[in-house]
Each structure stands twice: as structure tokens, then as C-alpha cells.
């Protein structure tokens, strides 16, 4: 529902674990999204193929648990959905950084964090101050 509500060209979806990634991928494929999983259960060739298909636009959703957290430059992505609120500030920053890079074809990015408690919301909002100091405009919207 969130993918439909917030129209974006390409999404990276971060999940809690591989099982959740597989289930989420199955659900969104049934809804007509072109998506694939990126994790360490796949062999190198399949991971590379999924990544290249995402970067070229053949896939519009790439689902991963931690394999894309660090070391990947994904300027093609203009949306991120974080389905697992990590207690690691570093991990959250890395995940958000996957889509915050501005390119010639992208003026902004959308990050949706699904959280379960008000405590998580307050913590995430406080962390956003770091990005505002770096001149990254942030707009918070609480969805029900």
C-alpha cells in the first residue's frame, strides 16, 4: 500500500531478515511490481544480475535485509522503505544514505520507516537533525 501511495521510480526495501525479504518480495510481485531479492543466499552471478536489473530500470524494487547496508552506491533509487527499525544508528544512516544521493535525474528521495512505537519515532526524528545540518531538507509525516 505504501509503495502505491508514494509513487517513486525505484525503491530499496530493507527488511529484518531473509525470510521477511522473501515474503515481502512475493507479496509485491503479486501486486505487479518488478522486484527481486538481494542477499547472501544468492550466488554472486544472481546478485549481480539483480543489481544490474535494478540499476538499469528492469526492476523497480530491490528487497534486502543487510546485504545493501554498506558499500553500495545506489543513486538510481529514489525511495527507501525500512521495515526493520534497527537499534544501530550507523545502520540506519547507511540505509538512508543509499537513496539520499542527488543525481541529474533525481531532485529528492523518499524514505519511509515503519516503526512500532512512539519511542522509535522520537529517536528517528532526533537523528534527522544531523541531515538538516548537512543541508538535506527533511520533512516528517506521521502516517497511521
What are these regions (language model features)?
Residues 1-12:
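Conserved interdomain linker/interface between the two RecA-like ATPase lobes of SF2 helicase motors
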Residues 10-14, 19-69:
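Conserved helicase ATPase core of P-loop NTP-dependent helicases/translocases
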Residues 88-96, 101-144:
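A conserved SF2-helicase RecA2
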Residues 25-26, 73-77, 93-94, 125-126:
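Short amphipathic alpha-helical segments
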Residues 53-56, 80-81, 99-100, 129-130:
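Short, hinge-like loop/turn segments at secondary-structure boundaries
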Residues 61-65, 69-86, 91-92, 108-114:
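A short beta-strand element within the Helicase C-terminal
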Residues 16, 40, 85, 114-116:
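Cofactor-binding loop segments of dinucleotide-utilizing enzymes, especially the Rossmann-like FAD-
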